[in-house]
Amino acid sequence: RDPEMSRGLGDVYKRQGYYFKPSGKLASGLTEIDGKKYIFESSTSAEHKGKVYKSTMVRYKKKWYIASSKGSLYKSGWRKYSGNYYYLKECVVQTNQFMKKNGVNGYLDANGKYTRGWVIVSNAKNLVRYIDPSGNGFARNKSMRVNGILYYFDRNGYRITDLTNRYRGPYSVQVDRVNGVMTVYADSARTIPVKTIRVSVGLAGTPTPTGNFTLSRSLRWQPLMGPSWGQYGTHVDGAGQGGIFVHSVACGQANSYNLPAVEYNKLGSPASHGCIRTCVADAKWVYENCNGAPISIIDGKYKADDAMKGPLGKKALTPLRGAANFDPTDPAV
């Protein structure tokens, strides 16, 4: 293209968000104009673009930028975008580091978003950390109360989700039907969570009843509807409905090698006729450690992140293996 013609067209295209360089080429990618930086859409051999980004966050060459309403990139300091705060240096959004804002410790995540408090590392693995408000990083090798709840953190800063070796009972149990989580507490006030269990409660047509009840140990192989059998049955006394139990995923026979894989994979979602299903290892633990414990069955507030479903998150499902006809947590196999 003739440079003089391009400069003439530039006045028209500039108003539409395009820019021609002095060479006559359409601006693409990160471009500096009159001391300010902009990012233009990148063109390819198959498609010509080139419009400037405005009022948005832009990912360019593995870095984040924030474009103003006129397209120029914000240079430095704190910027609010879409309700969140970001910190910039030389136009680049800073990521994966600790930063104080107004004297308060926080963390800039992988996308640069400033957050305080909990940082989710993995929903799939139920891994979270907590930004220590009194330090310069995550809480490590310590316990601390957050909103009245006592948490423990390991040397890597991860929330510890099983403290039953430290707290050996008596326990208090709470089941959240909405989030599919059973949380075991070391105190009656339920401020010291010590174990999280992934559960399936009743389907909408056969709901697990809400209320306050008591757990009592029942049978090693619990007869259920069908007929079928669940391992390590613990009765929810007073819940009615012909008998509500905590038990493992039911099998067609009273042995460990006829597990219905489809039902096992539903753990964490409503699936039962009213009972509270768990994996075998957790059913066994409740059977052995919660005889006589109070249990409260509630509808909690829905949480989108599994790691935040309950104070200790939602325990990850142990994947099936081998012939997939047995519970992988079953100590008998």
Model-predicted segments: where are they?
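Short amphipathic beta-strand/extended segments with alternating polar/hydrophobic composition
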Residues: R7, A67, I131, A189-G202, ...
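Soluble periplasmic/extracytoplasmic beta-strand elements of cell-envelope proteins
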Residues: Y19, Y107, Y152, S172-Q174, ...
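Extracellular adhesion/carbohydrate-binding repeat motifs centered on closely spaced tryptophans
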Residues: R1, R7, D11-P170, G226
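A short, compositionally biased
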Residues: K125, R140, V175-V181, W229-G230, ...
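Cell wall/extracellular polymer interaction/catalysis modules
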Residues: R155-L219, Q231-Y232, K314, T318-A323, ...
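Exported/periplasmic cell-wall-interacting domains
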Residues: P207-T210, L219-V333
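A mature extracytoplasmic/lumenal domain signature
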Residues: G24, T44, G71, V92, ...
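A generic structural motif
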Residues: S122, Y185-D187, D237, I298
